[in-house]
Design a protein with these regions (language model features):
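Cap/insert and terminal regions of metallo-dependent hydrolase folds
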Residues: 27-216
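Core dinuclear metal-dependent hydrolase active-site scaffold
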Residues: 1-14, 18-29, 35, 67-69
């Protein structure tokens, strides 16, 4: 269930999941422990975990792809033999490096998917990709009606979402841009990345896990 409210005194729209702003700089919370970023920045299990700005941004970009698509189109799952090839070798016998186990194999052009969902220095405002494919296929008109209502809030200036960058600038024109995108061909962007989510949605619907009736 999506919950949102408009805080009048700060002119800020608070949302749970539906609208997010994604940028290339990792959230500051990773400064306490950047290990997840550094782990995902590698291409093989035997690569050392090096802490630098480039590795943090690379790891963050891949985490964004995971959270947006669950199984991105540019990601392959290697064989078990490849996964454990470097495990438990010297220098890798520790939890931080996950003992050299690395079950991911990224295509060389994996970064191409980021163009549509990540801003370089300014958060890219969008409907959360995972919800776009798992929740909103059957409730597109409900989503549009909600955005039309939000657009009427006077003096709206900021957005705080439960995920990714916050607060970010968010005004009537940003809301209208989302509406226009939903009503355009761009709404079905990145078909290769969305393939897993689309198939998952169909399966959940067939099993009755996703109810046929839309609750508003």
């Amino acid at each position: 269930q999506e919950v949102s409210c408009f805080h009048l005194s700060t002119r800020t729209l608070h949302v749970t999941d539906a609208i997010v702003g994604i940028e290339s700089t990792p959230p500051e919370i990773f400064d306490f422990d950047p290990t997840p970023l550094l782990f995902h920045s590698r291409d093989r299990g035997d690569e050392p975990i090096l802490d630098n700005v480039e590795s943090r941004k690379k790891g963050w970009a891949r985490i964004v792809l995971f959270s947006s698509f669950l199984k991105p189109g540019k990601l392959n799952i290697p064989s078990l033999k490849q996964i454990i090839k470097y495990s438990f070798k010297e220098g890798l016998r520790n939890k931080k490096s996950h003992f050299g186990i690395y079950p991911f194999l990224w295509d060389e052009d994996w970064e191409s998917s980021l163009v549509e969902i990540m801003g370089e220095n300014i958060p890219k405002i969008q409907i959360a990709p995972v919800l776009q494919n798992l929740i909103f296929p059957r409730s597109k008109q409900v989503l549009l009606g909600w955005l039309e209502k939000i657009k009427t809030y006077e003096n709206m200036e900021y957005l705080i979402s439960a995920h990714y960058s916050a607060p970010i600038n968010f005004k009537e024109e940003n809301c209208q841009n989302l509406i226009d995108e939903i009503n355009s061909d761009k709404w079905n962007k990145l078909p290769d990345d969305n393939k897993f989510l689309v198939n998952l949605y169909k399966k959940l619907f067939e099993l009755g896990i996703i109810p046929k009736k839309v609750n508003v």
